[in-house]
C-alpha cells in the first residue's frame, strides 16, 4: 500500500488464508536473528478482523521460528509468546502480556533480544516509550539455531493472519539500551500519532496545574481574584491574564479542547503552554484577608 502520509506500508486485510498467502516473509531471517543479540523495531496498527474474532492468540505481528521453538511477537490480544506451542497449534505454551494495546491506532514496538554469558535468550519489549514486558529466559538460543524463518502477520501452523498495517520495520544487529528503545518507540509513536500525544500531554498538564493550585491553597497561598486597572500595572502589562478566575477559565477551555476530536496538534500544545504561563504569572495577595492588589 502506498499511503500519502507514510509512503509505502504493508497492509494486511485478509484475516484467514489456507494457501500460505497474504502475509510477508522476512528474507535472510537466519542472518538477522541467528545471533546473540538484535533489536526488532516496528510501527504496527492492529485492525479488527472481519470474522473469527475470537481467534486472538493465533494472530501475531511477527513470528520468529526455529523448528519447534517460536517467538510470537505481539498477538492480537497484546501478548508475546515464546518456546514451544501449547495444546493449540500456533499458540505458544508460554506467554506474557504487554498490557492494553490500542486497536486501530499506530503503536511503536522495540523487541530487544540478548543472550548473556552463553545463556538462553532474554527478551525485553518496549511499547510507545515504555518498557511493557520482559522474559528473562525464553528457553532456547537463537544463536545456535540453523533453521530460522520469520514472518509478518502470520503464526506458523495457523491460517489466521493479524490484519492491520505495518511500517518502519528495522532489525538492528545489537540489543539497544533501555533508554534508546524507550526514546525510539516514543518518537515513532509521536510521529505517527502527533495529536494523540499532544492530547495526552494537555491532559497531564491540566491535572498538574489543578494539583498545584490545590497544594497552594493547602499552604495558605491566596491568588488575586480581581484584575488590576491599567494604571496599577508597572510596565506594559495591561490585560495580562494573572488572576485565579482567568486561570480557571483557561482550565475549563482546555477541558473542552481535549474532548474535541477535531482539535489540532498545534492547538493542543499551545493550550498546554498557555496554562504553564498563566500559572507562573498568577498574582499573589500579600495577606489572606486583604483586597490590596499584590504585585
Regions found by a protein language model. Name each.
Residues 41, 51-68, 125, 153, ...:
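Aromatic-rich beta-strand patches that line glycan-recognition/binding surfaces
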Residues 28-40, 97-107, 142-143, 159-165:
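Extracellular/lumenal carbohydrate-interaction signature centered on repeated Trp-anchored short motifs
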Residues 135-165:
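Flexible glycan-contacting loops in extracellular carbohydrate-active proteins
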Residues 65, 83-87, 126-128, 153, ...:
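Predominantly extracellular/luminal cell-surface or secreted proteins
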Residues 1-21, 41-51, 70-139:
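Extracellular glycan-interaction surfaces
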Residues 4-5, 168-196:
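Extended recognition patches within non-cytosolic domains
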Residues 23-28, 91-97, 153-156:
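Short structured motifs
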Residues 191-295:
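Beta-rich interaction/scaffold domains
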Amino acid at each position: 500500500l502506498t499511503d500519502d502520509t507514510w509512503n509505502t506500508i504493508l497492509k494486511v486485510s485478509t484475516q484467514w488464508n489456507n494457501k500460505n498467502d497474504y502475509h510477508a516473509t522476512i528474507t535472510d531471517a537466519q542472518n538477522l536473528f541467528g545471533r546473540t543479540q538484535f533489536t526488532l523495531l516496528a510501527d504496527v496498527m492492529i485492525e479488527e478482523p472481519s470474522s473469527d474474532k475470537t481467534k486472538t492468540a493465533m494472530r501475531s505481528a511477527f513470528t520468529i521460528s526455529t523448528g519447534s521453538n517460536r517467538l510470537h511477537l505481539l498477538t492480537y490480544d497484546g501478548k508475546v509468546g515464546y518456546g514451544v506451542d501449547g495444546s493449540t497449534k500456533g499458540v505458544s505454551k508460554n506467554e506474557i502480556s504487554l498490557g492494553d494495546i490500542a486497536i486501530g491506532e499506530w503503536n511503536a514496538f522495540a523487541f530487544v533480544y540478548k543472550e548473556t554469558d552463553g545463556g538462553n535468550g532474554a527478551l525485553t519489549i518496549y511499547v510507545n516509550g515504555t518498557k511493557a514486558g520482559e522474559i528473562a529466559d525464553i528457553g532456547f538460543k537463537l544463536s545456535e539455531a540453523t533453521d530460522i524463518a520469520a514472518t509478518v502477520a502470520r503464526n506458523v501452523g495457523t491460517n489466521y493472519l493479524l490484519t492491520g498495517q505495518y511500517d518502519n520495520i528495522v532489525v538492528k544487529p545489537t540489543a539497544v539500551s533501555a533508554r534508546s528503545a524507550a526514546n525510539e518507540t516514543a518518537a515513532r509513536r509521536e510521529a505517527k500519532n502527533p495529536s494523540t500525544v499532544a492530547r495526552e500531554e494537555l491532559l497531564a498538564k491540566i491535572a498538574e496545574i489543578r494539583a498545584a493550585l490545590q497544594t497552594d491553597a493547602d499552604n495558605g497561598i491566596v491568588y488575586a481574584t480581581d484584575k488590576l486597572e491599567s494604571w496599577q500595572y508597572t510596565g506594559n502589562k495591561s490585560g495580562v491574564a494573572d488572576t485565579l478566575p482567568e486561570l480557571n477559565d483557561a482550565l475549563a477551555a482546555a477541558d473542552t479542547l481535549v474532548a474535541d476530536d477535531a482539535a489540532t496538534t498545534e492547538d493542543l500544545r499551545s493550550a498546554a503552554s498557555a496554562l504553564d504561563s498563566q500559572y507562573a504569572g498568577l498574582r499573589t495577595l500579600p495577606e489572606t484577608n486583604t483586597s490590596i492588589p499584590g504585585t
